[in-house]
Amino acid sequence: MLGIKRITGAAGLAPKGEPGSWVSDAAREKFMAAYGRVFALWPQPCEEVDIETAAATTRVHAYRQHPGGEPIVLLSAFNAAAWFPHVAALGQDGPVYGIDMPGDANPSVPRALMTPPDACAAWLDELLGKLSDRPAHLVGFSYGGWMAMNQAIRAPGRVASITLLDPAGLTKLDARFWLWMSISGLATLAPMPLRRRFARWLDSPAMLQPELMTLMWAGTRGYHAEPKFPAVLTDDELRSITVPTLLITGARSALLTPTEARARGSLMPHAEVAVVPGSHGGFNRIDELNDRMTAFIEAHATSKQAALPRQPPATEQ
């Protein structure tokens, strides 16, 4: 990883115990220019709102074609940019909210560390309460998958279901993961003909999206991110997840093997586990992934449940 930082000029991680921060005002301005171009890829109309909680000001991207339905909340590290191929499909019956995780390169502003499990759950619970008076279906990729599980463990009251796409937190990160990270980082610097080959091999279509790559490098070089390497969830913690759960991982995942996915998934009382071709949780087969996610969420709608108390609404930008 040190070699990649030297080659790319990556800013590195925030000092231990400190929230994320920008390298400079110029770095933030460069990032925000790329950020605007990427979110133009989201289906329209899409609103940007800033939500105040005790721990952070959180930027949320709201797609509300059907505002009366049950909310779907998209979770990942970095920001919500890469969710654009999934938003319209997920938003056919209710609002979709993409979260820019505080402590990473995005407009959200952390006022405290976001990575301690209890702190993360408290922040997200408060955020969910300000988004809707209905339980939310959480969809999390990688670190966002850990966030969804952590929420279901520590603050499940506002959670209707969780969908986990190649989630972190189920197994210890090993050499396979770090090798994949190194190859992926270097592949994004390759000329486009070679990058296409890497994208096929790594099952990473985002690598071929120029707007996403520009945004990624602007963030990597311009922001000291809060380290996000969650501890592996214990067997008892997984057994305590009682909400409906869909776990999707790739047969060649760098995070967990199919055997690990099935074994750890079996500990969650109401989990379905799907192993799909490729390295990720189905991102290389967008239509199939969207169909699988929407079918699961529809099957576990909580429309007949009593509404939760709603907190004050967000302010629009």
Regions found by a protein language model. Give the residues of each.
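Short beta-strand/loop motif that positions the catalytic acidic residue
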Residues: 241, 247-249
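Alpha/beta-hydrolase fold catalytic core
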Residues: 1-71, 94, 134, 287, ...
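Conserved alpha/beta-hydrolase catalytic His-Asp/Glu region
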Residues: 173-179, 187-242
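Acidic catalytic loop of the alpha/beta-hydrolase fold
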Residues: 252-256, 281-282
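Conserved HGGG/HGGXW glycine-rich cap/lid loop of the alpha/beta-hydrolase fold
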Residues: 59, 63-106
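Flexible "cap/lid" loop of the alpha/beta hydrolase fold
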Residues: 149, 153, 161-188
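Active-site loop/oxyanion-hole signature of alpha/beta-hydrolase fold enzymes
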Residues: 97-139
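Catalytic histidine-centered segment of alpha/beta-hydrolase-like enzymes
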Residues: 278-290
